[in-house]
A protein has these predicted regions:
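C2-type phospholipid-binding modules
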Residues: 16-25, 65-118
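Extracellular and analogous surface-interaction loops
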Residues: 1-3, 60-63
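Calcium-regulated, polybasic anionic-phospholipid
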Residues: 4-50, 78
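Beta-strand-rich interaction surfaces with strong enrichment in secreted/lumenal proteins
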Residues: 40-46, 58-60, 95
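Exposed aromatic-hydrophobic patches
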Residues: 50-62, 92
Length: 118
């Protein structure tokens, strides 16, 4: 088990103005990845402005594993048999986002659109 100093709490609050998907309904969810660890929000049904208010703990030794960023992917949950659709991703640079243990940052991050979502 990782030491308490090796934990990173990631809170995904919301998104706004997400791309509509083919068929018109968007069922977005977010996946936060840091190194090999990840956490995921629940699916917000039929909205392009989801409110997740979701927290996850990621246990990773940032220095030991040479981890310097979190990747946040926003996906559309495809309710049919097809694969989920990537709506875009944001990269959070931990070198500038984390000032010291116990400090929270509250920022909006723009999604870089996934290929084919123009």
């Amino acid at each position: 088990m990782a030491d308490i100093s090796d934990r990173l709490e990631v809170k995904v609050v919301s998104a706004r103005s997400l791309s509509e998907v083919e068929g018109g309904e968007c069922n977005p969810f977010a996946v936060a990845r840091c190194g090999s660890e990840f956490g995921q929000t629940l699916v917000a049904n039929r909205t392009t402005d989801p409110e997740w208010q979701s927290s996850t703990m990621i246990f990773v030794d940032i220095a030991e594993n040479d981890v310097d960023h979190i990747v946040l992917n926003v996906m559309h949950k495809n309710l049919s048999a097809q694969a989920d659709v990537d709506l875009g991703a944001a990269i959070v640079d931990l070198r500038t986002a984390i000032l010291s243990p116990g400090i929270e940052t509250d920022e909006w991050y723009a999604l870089q659109r996934a290929p084919g979502m123009d």
